[in-house]
């Protein structure tokens, strides 16, 4: 199964790769380096020059060559490797006529539990979205930032007491909207210091969040582990990690109970299954990160079908309508992916990833690059949001 062509495909706000064999079979993947997709596309083209003319089947070999050649990596590089790896698994499944999860040992489950995204600049908006999603059958919601996603151009400042009390009250309001049969996945987006993270986590304990995601920037596993050791609720982190050893360092320090590998950034399905096995050894649960398109979701579901420690799958739904419907962004770009039902989604069982890009979609959907932007602080610096 020789590779004839490797194409980076920027479509809308996403970056795909399409690998075509000499027989005309195609596989697709997606890069998760979403802030720097232009650089990731260049890396895809460079790796493509290596892959063309080679057999697509020895995926682990190609994965090692791409990771170990030229010594240097980083998100743009691992995003490219991840996209290519996913596409190679897609190709292999299609060649053999089986879904990717069959190649990973077979399905442990036929559907995956989802948590839907909730967005809103006010707590009233967030609470309304939680209620709508509960009525639509979802059993968990996430992307819940009790610090709120305010106008990114407005300079930020909050006194400590106000910041903590408002956030705790917001979580209480979200729990009221969710009831007791819906889990809350609290997402902080790295906006706290170590003492703030401890204060907030202790304050929201009575509302039983499923996890407390990314309270701190992830670069310092010792700081994350210190927080984990001083709070009564579990931490989830890892979406910015680009490889296995970052997760190993975090777990060795007991810095998280839920791991958030981005399959489109951490090395694709090959990297993801290594991280899942590592997590299993530490009794850590896997919550695949997915703020991307249905291609990313399909890759997450294929891996999630075949691992024992899948906790829940992130589902980046758009804000729900009045009927509670939760539409997946960019759903129109692919075919073959079911809609959620009762808070779960069926894992595709067609060959490969079980989905396809709509033919010619790259010519109909203009590229939408992401500008460099951060929220200013009143002191002249910047803050994460």
Predicted segments, located by residue:
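Shared catalytic-loop signature of beta/alpha-barrel
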Residues: 42-49, 58-61, 202, 208-211, ...
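Glycine-rich phosphate/pyrophosphate-binding beta-alpha loops
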Residues: 10-14, 30-37, 81, 117-121, ...
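Extended hydrophobic packing segments that form well-structured cores
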Residues: 352-385
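Glycine-rich, aromatic-flanked loop segments that form ligand/cofactor-binding clefts
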Residues: 85-121, 125, 136
């Amino acid at each position: 199964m020789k590779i004839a062509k490797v194409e980076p495909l920027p479509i809308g706000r996403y970056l795909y790769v399409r690998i075509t064999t000499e027989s005309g079979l195609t596989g697709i993947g997606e890069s998760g380096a979403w802030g720097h997709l232009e650089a990731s596309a260049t890396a895809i083209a460079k790796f493509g020059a290596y892959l063309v003319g080679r057999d697509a089947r020895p995926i682990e070999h190609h994965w090692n060559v791409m990771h170990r050649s030229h010594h240097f990596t980083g998100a743009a590089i691992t995003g490219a490797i991840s996209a290519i790896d996913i596409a190679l698994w897609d190709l292999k499944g299609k060649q053999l006529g089986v879904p990717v999860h069959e190649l990973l040992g077979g399905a442990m489950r036929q559907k995956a539990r989802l948590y839907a995204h909730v967005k809103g600049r006010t707590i009233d908006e967030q609470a309304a979205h939680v209620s709508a999603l509960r009525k639509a059958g979802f059993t968990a919601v996430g992307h819940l930032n009790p610090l709120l996603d305010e106008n990114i151009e407005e300079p930020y400042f909050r006194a400590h007491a106000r910041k903590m009390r408002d956030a705790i009250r917001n979580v209480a309001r979200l729990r009221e909207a969710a009831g007791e049969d819906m889990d809350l996945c609290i997402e902080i987006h790295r906006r706290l210091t170590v003492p703030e993270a401890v204060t907030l986590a202790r304050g929201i304990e009575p509302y039983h969040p499923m996890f407390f995601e990314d309270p701190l920037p992830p670069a310092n596993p010792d700081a994350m582990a210190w927080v984990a050791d001083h709070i009564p609720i579990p931490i989830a982190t890892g979406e910015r990690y680009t490889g296995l050893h970052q997760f190993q360092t975090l777990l060795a320090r007991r810095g998280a109970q839920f791991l958030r590998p981005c399959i489109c950034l951490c090395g694709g399905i090959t990297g993801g299954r290594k991280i899942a096995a590592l997590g299993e050894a530490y009794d850590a649960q896997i919550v695949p990160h997915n703020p991307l398109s249905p291609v990313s979701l399909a890759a997450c579901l294929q891996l999630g079908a075949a691992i024992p420690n899948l906790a829940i799958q992130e589902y980046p739904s758009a804000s729900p309508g009045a009927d509670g419907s939760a539409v997946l962004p960019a759903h129109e770009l692919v075919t073959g992916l079911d809609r959620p039902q009762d808070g779960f989604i069926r894992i595709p069982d067609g060959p490969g990833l079980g989905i396809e890009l709509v033919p010619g979609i790259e010519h109909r959907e203009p590229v939408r690059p992401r500008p460099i932007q951060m929220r200013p602080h009143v002191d002249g610096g910047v803050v994460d949001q």
